[in-house]
Amino acid sequence: MEWARLIAGLAHYSGDVGLAEELAQDAVVAALEQWPEDGVPRNPGAWLMTVAKRRAIDLFRRNRELERKYAQIGRDLDTAGAGGTSDFDQVVSDDIDDDLLRLIFTACHPVLAVPARVALTLRLLGGLTTAEIARAYLVPEPTIAQRIVRAKKTLAKAHVKFETPDSQQRPARMSSVLEVIYLIFNEGYSATAGEDWMRPALCHEALRLGRVLAQLAPAEPEVHGLQALMEIQASRIPARTGPAGEPVLLLDQDRARWDRLLINRGLAALSRAEELGGARGPYALQAAIAACHARAFRPEDTDWARITELYAILAKAMPSPVVELNRAVAVSMAFGPQAGLDLVDQLAAEPALRSYHLLSSVRGDLLMKLGRAAEARAEFERASELTRNGPERQLTAMRARCAEANVHIDISGWSPKRIPPEVIRELRGRLNGQFLWGSDYPFLAPERCLSELSDLGLPADALQTVLHDNAARILGLNR
């Protein structure tokens, strides 16, 4: 965060974010040249600020219109001393946190397009290089560089002041800040495109920014709501991929791998949001939904009825077809797949979801649970075509293959007494298909059959579907 503090302090004095970054870069270059020979100063931050301000004086001397700023910075240098050893907070400002908050609001100013806000935030507040940002978003480096340059020019042309918004503008401006931070987190959590299911570095950067913002704006309930949401979602990152990097869906995850420390931090942040009266803000509501999952040590312990209620409230606070789709999933888990499918079918005509791969994926999942395998396969194939993420494409393609009706589990030569108890329990429950029985295949031991089935790496719902379509008739079960 030292980089952001340096830029924030310089922007406070110069009133120009672009110039502040240039001054900070010059100071860092000077440090790289001098510190190896002279040693690292006792207070590196103060040293960098002093060098940057001296560079600013050189620039301001060439421009009489900036004489006032020159005098102000000169007075600060006199106070700080030539050695630059004064306390960093005193060199920058009596309240550096205010400068950081101003920098956040400036980088996320609504005058900028959303992609520009994201790039500028990662550059100025995250300290990421243009190359790092480009790699994270699969965009050519020159594109990111130009995006940042244009953003700075736009701020200057619009005469955006380096300040926090007034009370009337603050809610809308804070909403813009939260949106940018969550966009960064989401791109890391579920990558839009490319061959990575996740990009954890973006998640961690967004989470860090969220924590800083919660310290800078402690009275804002939705700030704590966003922090809570990101903490809880980030807790699942270790369990969201398998050994080969393949996606692992929520209900299939090993919950023992969830980070309980992050969950506890998220629950604490959610409590702060609720104490501040923000329990029904969009981010706090999403955090409350995430908390329902976090509190369930097993998938079957999940309070789906409560999640359904929370999604209904969220749909009113933040109307969106995507929210309605998520609500349909919760309804299906609470009240059965047909209830969920009825809601999903109502969303099919939504223009915003026409090319949304998760609509087809959810519909395919519900159709599979209803035994409509052929229709489900078509939906999974469509989802596979629509997604731009490689691992997600492989996942939906595999689910499409698993929907084929000719997938069987061969138990030739088995006695019913030798069928594993786990399988019998499933067959006596919701599985009512058939195993392949009496074929020409050689005898397969139950242990080997189950081992080979497990090695396929099928998601839990796909495994249930295979069993559903191929349950053993010898057990007296009818489809």
What feature does the model see in each segment?
Residues M1-A8, G18-E21, P171-E179:
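A short, charge-rich alpha-helical start-of-domain segment used by transcription regulators
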Residues L6, L10, L48, A52-F60:
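Hydrophobic-face residues of short alpha-helical interaction/recognition segments
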Residues I7-A24, Q34-N43, E141-P142, T192-D196:
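Short, charged helix-capping/linker segments at alpha-helix termini
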Residues E22-V29, R42-R54:
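Structural recognition of an alpha-helix C-terminal capping motif at a helix-to-coil junction
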Residues N63, A71-P115, R123-T130, V139-A312:
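Amphipathic helix-loop-helix modules that constitute alpha-helical solenoid scaffolds
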Residues A378, A397-L436:
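Catalytic pocket-lining loop regions of alpha/beta-barrel enzymes
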Residues M398, L431-Q434, L444-R479:
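Mid-to-C-terminal alpha-helical segments outside catalytic/metal-binding sites
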